[in-house]
Amino acid sequence: MYMDQRLWPYRTPGIPDDLFIRDESIPITKEEVRVIALSKARLREGYMVIDVGSGTGSISIEAAIQVGSTGRVYAIDRDADAIALLRENVRRFSITNIEIVHGDAMDILPSMPEVDAVFVGGAGGRMYDMVRVACTRLRSKGRIVVDTIMVESMSSALNAMYDLGLEDVDVTQVIVAKGRRISSGTMLIARNPVLIISAEKP
């Protein structure tokens, strides 16, 4: 058994944010953005996945559910506090097919196995190089998915993808507004736009 289904007894992605243990100093890929990012990766049972800049672990955990007991997720983060929080969330969901790796992804990626999908949620200002190195771990027809709030990071990711000759390059801007109950009814509170850049290795 690769997860305890009592907390989230569904295969559908989109675990509510409040089910994760949170820390305001550590980023989380929000529920609606996460669903779109996961769809861009086109995961299947048994796939191998790398999550760079895993943060809270929301993408890693959702991906682990999608790839099932025969798949595996490698969650990489260089921040010790993020790694500790990730471990808490992995325990909370009783996920057994995630391998947590503490360190700089630029140093770690070259020794990682080939995978079917890579998520990049943090590059530390080195997005161009991160995408290039991450793609060395992708199998043919493997997919890379980058999410960022910075237009500069989007530009760097796109440049790397085009320079590498990746196919099916796609940019999606996600703008989410959530309802909040007030005394006279319900108002919508907008969240920051997020850019999702995805592509496929030939």
Show which residues each predicted segment covers:
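Glycine-rich helix-loop-beta junction characteristic of Rossmann-like nucleotide cofactor-binding loops
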Residues: S39-R44, I65-Q66, T136
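Conserved SAM-binding loop of SAM-dependent methyltransferases across substrates and taxa
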Residues: T56-S69
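Short beta-strand element of Class I
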Residues: T70-Y74
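S-adenosyl-L-methionine
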Residues: I76-E114
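Short SAM/SAH-binding signature in class I
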Residues: E114-G122
